[in-house]
């Protein structure tokens, strides 16, 4: 228990970065997908060869 307490004091859980699915990051990914020249604005998708985060492959 002592070791756990020391570890939590030295490295609080808030210091651990969260996963990449945060709302602000999702919006940034969607914006970058829209600006990509391979983006199809009608289908809201891009070809599977040029897929980036926030962009759905056109199938």
Curated annotation (Swiss-Prot):
Signal sequence annotation: 1-15
Taxonomic superkingdom: Eukaryota
GO cellular component, one term: extracellular region
Subcellular location: Secreted
Disulfide bonds listed in the record: 45-59, 46-55, 51-58
Coiled coil start-end: none
Positions annotated as propeptide: 16-44
Tissue-specificity statement: Expressed by the venom duct.
Keywords noted in UniProt: Disulfide bond, Secreted, Signal, Toxin
Sequence similarity: Belongs to the conotoxin M superfamily.
Domain-level remarks: The cysteine framework is III (CC-C-C-CC).
Protein name (database record): Conotoxin reg3.15
Taxonomic placement: Eukaryota, Metazoa, Spiralia, Lophotrochozoa, Mollusca
């Amino acid at each position: 228990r002592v070791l756990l307490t020391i570890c939590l004091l030295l490295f609080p859980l808030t210091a651990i970065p969260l996963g990449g699915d945060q709302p602000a990051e999702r919006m940034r990914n969607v914006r970058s997908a829209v600006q990509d020249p391979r983006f199809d604005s009608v289908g809201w998708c891009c070809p599977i060869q040029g897929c980036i985060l926030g962009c759905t492959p056109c199938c």
